[in-house]
């Protein structure tokens, strides 16, 4: 594994963009809006979101709050800037079946999530990948909703 690049060249505006994308991606997933996701993520990520939207199991995610973020790796490749950002955020989240029955989670409780989101700058930053943070299990394995899961707004 190559060592992480030093986080140089990122500006406060870049950090605001990453936090904004966290909120915007969750909002677009809540609305099941692939068109909105097309302006927030790469075509490959939009395809993954679309595949998850077709599931009979979906997430209800509300009140996403970014707690901490730090650059993990920043690099340029083929003339494009990339950044992997470790994010810790909390949200209210439940996993429901197609009938709206809660399978996992509690509507009144908050869950804390740690993930690394990778972005690519194509004029503006776009979401390129989401990975569980090192040393943590995948949210799906814990029964915790994922940003890319089928997400509906809370009733």
Tell where the protein language model's regions lie, with residue ranges:
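Core segments of small alpha/beta cavity-forming domains
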Residues: 1-76, 155
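A generic structural signal for ordered secondary structure
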Residues: 22, 83, 125-127
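Surface-exposed, charged secondary-structure patches
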Residues: 57-106
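Low-complexity, intrinsically disordered terminal/linker segments enriched in charged
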Residues: 107-155
